[in-house]
Swiss-Prot record:
It is found in: Cytoplasm. PANTHER family: GLUCOSE INHIBITED DIVISION PROTEIN A (PTHR11806), PROTEIN MTO1 HOMOLOG, MITOCHONDRIAL (PTHR11806:SF0). Belongs to the MnmG family. NAD(+) binds at residues 273-287. Homodimer. Heterotetramer of two MnmE and two MnmG subunits. Its cofactor is FAD. NAD-binding protein involved in the addition of a carboxymethylaminomethyl (cmnm) group at the wobble position (U34) of certain tRNAs, forming tRNA-cmnm(5)s(2)U34. PROSITE patterns: GIDA_1, GIDA_2. One of its GO terms (molecular function) is flavin adenine dinucleotide binding. This is tRNA uridine 5-carboxymethylaminomethyl modification enzyme MnmG. One of its GO terms (cellular component) is cytosol. The keyword Glycoprotein does not apply. The lineage of its organism: Bacteria, Pseudomonadati, Pseudomonadota, Gammaproteobacteria, Enterobacterales.
């Protein structure tokens, strides 16, 4: 039977991608349905209890700048906040927070249940309704049919999921949840390329059985960082430390002696695992010269006794997991409350997607999250927001939108996936971006909030706050530009006390701030340049914009040159065999990838600059050279 009301957008799956997709579509005024197999696990942290990190924190800030949920949720649920790379330049500084799993899930569910235009329905989806290569709805396990103009698949590791512990395995979407086998079979019937990937999680430890007195503590930062541009530290719950232990030669011997019982090394697992979050058995074998690996003992919450030992993800048998855990300092009497495991699951080749995350072959069908070959909550959330907003735009008969690589880490993520694809779980790093200095955490709102407002994602409160910040930055920069001090002025002695070389000529506030030894806080503590801005975010922007002005201008020039290629469009139906002069390898790769632009084509492995030149000449001769606005 059909549900009585049609929807504009259906989201299938309530993880980090699904919740952001649902919120985005609903915020844009589209009637949205979120289908989940269990309402109680909306926003569930299936693996590590943390948000952010290098590259990942940048994505969270971008999701927040576009009105998303993740940053607000972690501000309400974070139990330890830190800035990573704090001593380095602003481009690579990244926020990370430990989370209370229960508080995080509660924050996500509360936001979803209070979002207008959004209905949540608990039922597993077993089928899609596809008519003439267009998705028009979904069918649940009890046969209930829902109609919609667009459908977003955010099903995580549930598609034909298989859990491995030692040489034993069973079907599962994650520990305690059933897999989605009928939907997996249905998707395999569609003209989509599908493969298998693998990820894993460590055993959870009972905190009451760990001797923390012999372990080093790791505390959060003070003052506490904040994730959301709309947040403040007063929202954070109680803060707690993490602890550090290490593996040792005994640990490594246990692992080496039991590799024949590892499903990965025994050849039972087909899927490729994450390169940057390897299992402990993988680390021991790949880094055989290392006699120890650092393990972070992370609390799972304020009201839980469970500890997440970050760094010992494993699929070895339970008895071996016990030996591994008890071989480490402080853990000699530790008890495991949940075994570690590996999970193998279907993913779909993201090269079959447009940059909007819509399928190239099934109109109105969008993919986001681990189904696209990524790993991590943050990567999933960013894709979910993009897929949700584009599903909403499609349902409203509007053109899709995707950020450029020069505009956002989200743009880098989507371009990497859709242009290059992935053979292993993809994780975001700052090193993946060519324009890191422009794509900082601190300026995510300056880069994206205006576009978010145009798209209908940003509410009035955020928009007002954003404009206040912009005005504060502009006013303060003008004030510093127009405030001068001379070597003979009474205030010169106070200024010189903060400088490595004293003033030799007249200098403005901005001139002084450009000096490496002068910070904004120091400058505005001087009588001549007081007072400082009360808005700490605006003050940070003033300092970064002034200090890095030359570098930023140079990178902006590079971006403008690159945009000429990015904006040169390639016809979606072009058969590259028509282009004389291209090698067979280049023809095969271009026909396989079907890049949307010259810029995308240039990033495909094996497509040479010479091939790009041939292609540009051919397009011009054919009168097909078009540039996007």
């Amino acid at each position: 039977m059909f549900y009585q009301d049609p929807f504009d957008v259906i989201i299938i799956g309530g993880g980090h991608a699904g919740t952001e997709a649902a919120m985005a579509a609903a915020r844009m005024g589209q009637q949205t349905l979120l289908l989940t197999h269990n309402i109680d696990t909306l926003g569930q942290m299936s693996c590590n209890p943390a948000i952010g990190g290098i590259g990942k924190g940048h994505l969270v800030k971008e999701v927040d700048a576009l009105g998303g949920l993740m940053a607000k949720a972690i501000d309400q649920a974070g139990i330890q906040f830190r800035i990573l790379n704090a001593s380095k330049g602003p481009a690579v500084r990244a926020t990370r927070a430990q989370a209370d799993r229960v508080l995080y899930r509660q924050a996500v569910r509360t936001a979803l249940e209070n979002q207008p235009n959004l209905m949540i329905f608990q039922q597993a989806v077993e089928d899609l309704i596809v008519e003439n290569d267009r998705v028009v709805g979904a069918v649940t396990q009890m046969g209930l049919k829902f109609r919609a103009k667009a459908v977003v698949l955010t099903v995580g590791t549930f598609l034909d999921g298989k859990i491995h512990i030692g040489l034993d395995n069973y079907s599962g979407g994650r520990a305690g949840d059933p897999p989605s086998i009928p939907l997996s079979r249905r998707l395999r019937e569609l003209p989509l390329r599908v493969s298998r990937l693998k990820t894993g999680t460590p055993p959870r430890i009972d905190a009451r059985t760990i001797d923390f007195s012999v372990l080093a503590q790791q505390h959060g930062d003070n003052p506490m960082p904040v994730f959301s541009f709309m947040g403040n530290a007063s929202q954070h719950p109680q803060q707690v430390p993490c602890y550090i232990t290490h593996t040792n030669e005994k640990t490594h011997d246990v692992i080496r002696n039991n590799l024949d019982r590892s499903p990965m090394y025994a050849g039972v697992i087909e899927g490729i695992g994450p390169r940057y979050c390897p299992s402990i058995e993988d680390k021991v074998m790949r880094f055989a010269d290392r006699n120890q690996h650092q393990i972070f003992l992370e609390p799972e919450g304020l009201t839980s006794n469970e500890i997440y030992p970050n760094g010992i993800s494993t699929s070895l048998p339970f008895d071996v997991q016990m030996q591994i855990v008890r071989s480490m300092q402080g853990m000699e009497n530790a008890k495991i409350v949940r075994p570690g495991y590996a999970i193998e699951y279907d993913f779909f080749d993201p090269r079959d997607l447009k940059p909007t995350l819509e399928s190239k072959f099934i109109h109105g069908l969008f993919f986001a999250g681990q189904i696209n070959g990524t790993t991590g909550y943050e990567e999933a959330a960013a894709q979910g927001l993009l897929a949700g907003l584009n599903a909403a735009r499609l349902s409203a008969d509007k053109e899709g939108w995707a950020p450029a690589r020069s505009q956002a880490y989200l743009g880098v993520l989507v371009d990497d996936l859709c242009t290059l694809g992935t053979k292993e779980p993809y994780r975001m790093f700052t090193s993946r971006a060519e324009y890191r200095l422009m794509l900082r955490e601190d300026n995510a709102d300056l880069r994206l909030t205006e576009m978010g407002r145009e798209l209908g994602l940003v509410d009035d409160e955020r928009w007002a706050r954003f404009n206040e910040k912009l005005e504060s930055i502009e006013r303060e920069r003008q004030r510093l530009k127009s405030t001068w001090v001379t070597p003979s002025a009474e205030s010169a002695d106070e200024v010189n006390a903060h400088l490595t070389t004293p003033l030799s000529r007249e200098a403005s506030g901005e001139d002084l701030l450009r000096r490496p030894e002068m910070t904004y806080a120091q400058l505005t503590s001087l009588a001549a340049f007081a007072p400082a801005l009360e808005d700490e975010q605006a003050a940070e922007q003033v300092e970064i914009q002034v200090k890095y002005e030359g570098y930023i201008a140079r990178q902006q020039d590079e971006i403008e040159k690159q945009l000429r290629n990015e904006n040169t469009l390639l016809p979606a139906t072009l058969d590259y065999r028509q282009v004389s002069g291209l090698s067979n390898e280049v023809i095969a790769k271009l026909n396989d990838h079907k890049p949307a632009s010259i810029g995308q084509a240039s990033r495909i492995s094996g497509v040479t600059p010479a091939a790009i030149s041939i292609l540009l000449v051919w397009l011009k001769k054919q009168g097909m050279l078009r540039r996007s606005a």
